[in-house]
Swiss-Prot record:
GO terms for cellular component: Bfa1-Bub2 complex; cytoplasm; mitotic spindle pole body; spindle pole; spindle pole body. It is found in: Cytoplasm, Cytoskeleton, Spindle pole. It comes from Saccharomyces cerevisiae (strain ATCC 204508 / S288c). Interacts with BFA1. Gene3D superfamilies: putative rabgap domain of human tbc1 domain family member 14 like domains (1.10.8.270), Ypt/Rab-GAP domain of gyp1p, domain 3 (1.10.472.80). It holds the Pfam family RabGAP-TBC. Signal peptide: none annotated. Part of a checkpoint which monitors spindle integrity and prevents premature exit from mitosis. This cell-cycle arrest depends upon inhibition of the GTP-binding protein TEM1 by the BFA1/BUB2 complex. Keywords: Cell cycle, Cell division, Cytoplasm, Cytoskeleton, Mitosis. This is Mitotic check point protein BUB2. InterPro entries: Rab-GAP-TBC_dom, Rab-GAP_TBC_sf. SUPFAM superfamilies: Ypt/Rab-GAP domain of gyp1p.
Length: 306
């Protein structure tokens, strides 16, 4: 049994000290990438503990939503258009996760969001029933969890509580994320930032897929999963600094490229440990007020970044 498995098997899971210890173990030891069902269950359980997601009655709630059938034709067609393209070229994902599973989860989310909207109190962030990219956000959860209801429960926690501003109709949180990516790159690598700016390449042009999907649009998926291990532990705001790390890793190719925009459309395969090391190292260079914006822009719809 690993240190992580030993820790999560003990009773006081949600005590502050236990969470701190679990976060440290994620940083120092990490979770292995494995096809083994027990390892898959461990990762899902760790994500559940770190995000403080209750799985109580999750299967019953999921089945109740499934009984409602497909959502409206408009939403259902949007879902179908995207799920058919989800990680099409990744055989490991396709072998483990069916398109039907993606459709079921996203359809349930559309229904649950409509139900929440009917009960909405004034001031709650209006998460959309479906926005493009939700399929790619859901994919790592279905890939990593041993059951659909568990993946769905984590997905709702992620969407409603952890990154709600990214999933509004106008994607205002993701747009703020793009502005923060520009600002962070300017601080960390002024030369690369100026080069991209001179070529009229703002983060809103090249960075939105990685921002909106929390880097799950990048390859390979097993390395994305390791990034998510870290972000469940330390916060999904770290994704912005991870995207900066992707750019810094590519900088020499970007400078030499005749078409940097094409190069930036798909980041190359990466090693998660290296991206995490770089991203964590950048924190010391980021002014406190900018770091606070990185943290808050995921959940605060009123943040304005010029």
């Amino acid at each position: 049994m690993t240190s992580i498995e030993d820790l999560i098997s003990n009773p006081p899971l949600l005590l502050h000290s236990s969470l701190s210890q679990l976060r440290y173990l994620i940083l120092s030891e990490g979770l292995p990438i494995s096809e083994d069902k027990q390892q898959q269950r461990t990762r899902c359980y760790v994500w559940t503990v770190l995000s403080q997601t209750s799985m109580e009655a999750s299967t019953q709630r999921y089945l109740a939503l499934l009984k409602l059938g497909p959502p409206s034709t408009t939403i259902y067609q949007k879902i179908k258009n995207d799920t058919s393209r989800t990680f099409q070229t990744d055989p490991n994902f396709r072998n483990r996760v069916s398109e039907d599973a993606l459709i079921r989860c996203l359809s349930c989310f559309a229904w649950q969001t409509q139900q929440r909207r009917q009960k909405t109190r004034f001031g709650r962030i209006p998460v959309s029933t479906y926005v493009q990219g939700m399929n790619v956000l859901l994919a790592p959860l279905l890939y990593s969890c041993p059951s659909e209801p568990m993946a769905y429960q984590l997905f709702t926690k992620l969407c409603y509580e952890m990154i709600p501003t990214y999933l509004t109709k106008n994607l205002n949180g993701a747009q703020n994320g793009a502005k923060l990516l520009d600002i962070s790159l300017r601080i960390i690598d002024p030369k690369l930032s100026k080069f991209l700016s001179d070529n009229l390449l703002t983060a809103e042009i090249y960075g939105m897929p990685s921002i909106l999907t929390l880097s799950s649009c990048n390859k390979p998926l097993d390395q994305v999963i390791k990034l998510w291990d870290f972000m469940f532990a330390y916060g999904f705001h770290m994704n912005i600094l991870f995207v900066v790390a992707f750019l810094v890793k590519m900088r020499s190719k970007v400078f030499k490229s005749d078409s940097p925009v094409n190069l930036l459309r798909q980041f190359p395969d990466f090693d998660a440990d290296e991206i995490i090391r770089l991203g964590v190292g950048f924190i010391a260079k980021i002014p406190a007020q900018i770091y606070d914006l990185l943290v808050d822009h995921l959940t605060d719809p009123d943040i304005y970044i010029p």
